[in-house]
Amino acid sequence: MSENKFLPICKDDMIERGWEQCDFVLVTADAYIDHHSFGTAIISRVLENAGYKVGIIAQPDWKSVDDFKKLGRPRLGFLVNGGNMDPMVNHYTVSKKLRKKDLYTPKGEMGKRPDRATIVYCNKIREAYKDVNIVIGGIEASLRRFAHYDYWENKVRKSILVDSGADLLVYGMSEKQIVEVADFLNQGFDGKYIRHIPGTCYIADSLDEIYEEHIVLPSFKEVSSDKRTYAECFKIQYDEQDPVRGRTLVQEHNGKYVVINKPEMPLSREELDRVYALPYQKTYHPIYEKDGGIAAIEEVKFSLVSSRGCSGNCSFCAITFHQGRIVTSRSEDSIVEEAEEITKYDDFKGYIHDIGGPTANFRKPACKKQLTLGACKHKRCMSPGICKNMEVDHREYLHLLRRVRKLPGIKKVFIRSGLRYDYIMADKDDTFFKELVEHHVSGQLKVAPEHVSPNVLKYMGKPAGKTYDEFRRKFFRITERLGKKQFIIPYLMSSHPGCKLEDAIMLAEYLRDINYQPEQVQDFYPTPGTLSTTMFYTGLDPLTMEEVYIPRSKEEKAMQRALLQFKNPKNYNIVYDALVKAGREDLIGNGPKCLIRDKNSFGKGNNHSNHKSGGRKNRNENSGRRESEDKKRSSHSKKQRGNKSRGFDQKSQRGSKGKKRR
């Protein structure tokens, strides 16, 4: 028996296993990493467990068909994904500039995958084997299954199923449906005619071929020519994205019909345990050793996946359209067993980097009704506030963390996935919060409030009001009580739909009041499949059909970004222009509440800002020791601005930031 426990990547590997032919060949735009944080690994191992022979072609040269032929023609078909990240996001920044590194590629080298990899790979496979079955999946296919707005081309593109020429699309996490698809292919079915499986999409020649109850969406032609129709279409997709109550959706594309079956039910706890117990090698293929490995493994190698799905439903997040709103989780025993395995790694230093998921402190469905009735159609679980029916309980997660941190060989267990601070604050039992601060923060707790303007938070689907400030103050009280020096690092977003210049200034004032300057700011990135992207494209909120302000110009987006780093002298001129444009000259000058000094009030070499530039030292001023100062500042700031409509009361001006970006 071969010592190589990775799946075959070449003919020699197949010979070692005694294979003459693969059942499936999986083509991916990422390097081959056999770890359950990567879709390629999960799908290939699930199929292997079901008795199928799977080979891997990772990052093939798409300029010829040679790489696509290196494992031969598979008996049942090709499986294609664009990698763990949409290739366009992987390649380009929000300003559409080419990124410098690809963390899913040896040496971080760019250029090893094409733009729109799924489409390119399918075309090459068709060139190599004209009539072979092709099934596409992964994040790129999932989020582009409908006609969708494409930010990089600034137009509406067809469903990726149409553009790729594939026979079938599986969306979501796909473990259930890929095995069912494989079984039908194994029985001799043509991929084009496997049409009844939840979580799949196919193309029909006419509506008469669709037997399930369905909704006919506006066609590709209609949504690509009218933005209001696009928004209305997205609302239907959004409402039907539920495995319990969702219905089949149909969208015409130039005389043919893309049929999107309702989502597959999430895996049960027992099913998840089985998936995560498969024989992953938990690292990259040894062919990459000569290039120093693959950087993407580093963040997940000593991390544990606890859950899937998210009840948070943030507008800018794609989780709803990929994993869904119903949270499921692995058993404690499954996670503890994997933690014990990690302690045996030669390079393990005693630190578990994370136990989490899309949201670390979610371990179960938001309420009992979700598994029988589905998630609510016209309400969100946590926005604008936490639903009264949501079951807030950290006890199981807390028990899990305690078990793992007590294991021999483990020094610390950190939580680096996102935490919903509003969910933490809604828990009447403080035990989890206290133990989080005491045991699970690696010096800095990263959370994602994203903004402070109530208007912007409304469009983001994020909690508004005093919740974050209360969380921040409580975090520092507990930290101080424990005698620790720990900080909160907030994720912030600029230029989200609905964010006007005055909203960005409000956030800048908030950062001034807590004496914090973020080292990085994320501009809103319109990626496929999100509510926020639909707002960006149409200028409408699909949930209400009301108009939404969209910061589109490079000038305004630069202003909003610079305002969040107003202490940086390089941003002085653009911050000055932004304040003048907004009529907020009261924030220019030498007063304690001014963001920047007046141009005529400093000499050469002096800082333009009234505040020290925000490096690590300044960032760490965001601590509990400043709480009394925050209170004084808050009251004074409100009087100085004299504008309650800006969304602050005295209390809400005090805080900092907190929660994970999805």
Swiss-Prot record:
Start-end of Basic and acidic residues biased regions: 618-632
PROSITE patterns: RADICAL_SAM
Record flagged with keyword Iron: yes
An MF annotation (GO) of this entry: 4 iron, 4 sulfur cluster binding
Tree of life domain: Bacteria
Pfam families hit by this protein: DUF3362, Radical_SAM, Radical_SAM_N
Cofactors demanded by this protein: [4Fe-4S] cluster
InterPro entries assigned to the protein according to its UniProt record, in alphabetical order: Elp3/MiaA/NifB-like_rSAM, rSAM, rSAM_horseshoe, UPF0313, UPF0313_C, UPF0313_N
Residue span, Radical SAM core domain: 296-567
Keyword vocabulary terms for this entry: 4Fe-4S, Iron, Iron-sulfur, Metal-binding, S-adenosyl-L-methionine
Entry note: cofactor: Binds 1 [4Fe-4S] cluster. The cluster is coordinated with 3 cysteines and an exchangeable S-adenosyl-L-methionine.
Positions with biased composition (Basic residues): 633-644
Keyword field contains S-adenosyl-L-methionine: yes
NCBIfam families assigned: SAM_YgiQ
Family assignment from sequence similarity: Belongs to the UPF0313 family.
UniProt protein name: UPF0313 protein CPE1196
Source organism of this protein record: Clostridium perfringens (strain 13 / Type A)
